[in-house]
Regions:
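A short beta-strand-to-loop transition that corresponds to the Sensor-1 phosphate-sensing loop
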Residues: 1, 84, 112-117, 180
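Conserved nucleotide-binding/hydrolysis micro-motifs of P-loop NTPases
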Residues: 2, 26-29, 116-120, 139
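Conserved phosphate-binding/catalytic loops and adjacent sensor/switch elements of nucleotide-binding enzymes
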Residues: 3, 8-74, 87
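Generic structural signal for small/hydrophobic residues in well-ordered secondary structure
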Residues: 36-38, 83, 113, 146, ...
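Conserved P-loop NTPase "ATPase switch" module shared by AAA+ and STAND
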Residues: 68-93, 113
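Amphipathic alpha-helical "lid/sensor" segments that cap RecA-like P-loop NTPase cores
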Residues: 129-133, 148-190
Length: 190
């Protein structure tokens, strides 16, 4: 189900010069890490060649891959977005995520959009100082937000009506938008 994460990130990145997206798809083989290495090859040829030399990423070479990726240097700004990362997370060793989070700051920005980080959740949470998180509570709309959106759309909602919209939508922006487009009618969310 779409909760508005991708839309929120897409809007936030409007005007950013170089943004490249990878979208994971359920029930299809994950190629996100291979795509990531190819994108790095556009920015840091040396790292690309070093990663190519270790071939397919697995547990036996994850520490080596982490050391290589920790040395990545990107001069010009580039943002790589991994959408639906929950479909790829199991294929990314924790040491790789850790190395990427601890890299020296440069032009490389990584965004992982996921409904669930699975076994990588503790790895991401341990990086709290070096990783920016948008959690559910950061995306959910409040009654005041919903009343404000309704006013922008020329509607007038009472606090009770806004409460009903939250009850029916969970406060997720995409669902709230659809509800307001239907004059505040709400159905049950799956």
């Amino acid at each position: 189900m779409g909760y508005g994460k991708t839309t929120a990130v897409s809007h936030a990145l409007e005007g950013v010069e170089t943004v490249r997206w990878y979208t994971g798809v359920e029930h299809l083989p994950d190629t996100s890490f291979y795509w990531f290495i190819q994108q790095l090859g556009n920015e840091d040829e040396r790292t690309f060649r070093r990663m190519e030399s270790i071939s397919f990423l697995n547990r036996s070479n994850a520490a080596q891959a982490a050391r290589i990726l920790g040395d990545v240097r990107v001069e010009r700004p580039v943002t790589l977005v991994f959408d639906n990362f929950q479909f790829a997370a199991d294929n990314w060793p924790p040491q790789v995520i850790d190395a990427l989070a601890k890299r020296a700051e440069d032009g490389l920005h990584l965004i992982f959009i996921a409904q669930n980080l699975g076994r990588l959740r503790p790895v991401f949470e341990a990086q709290e100082g070096g990783v920016c998180f948008l959690r559910e509570k950061d995306l959910l709309l409040t009654q005041e937000d919903i009343c404000g959106l309704a006013r922008q759309g020329g509607m007038s909602l009472t606090r009770q009506q806004a409460k009903e919209v939250i009850r029916g939508t969970g406060g997720w922006p995409a669902a709230v938008s659809l509800s307001l487009a239907a004059d505040g009618e709400v159905g049950e969310m799956d």
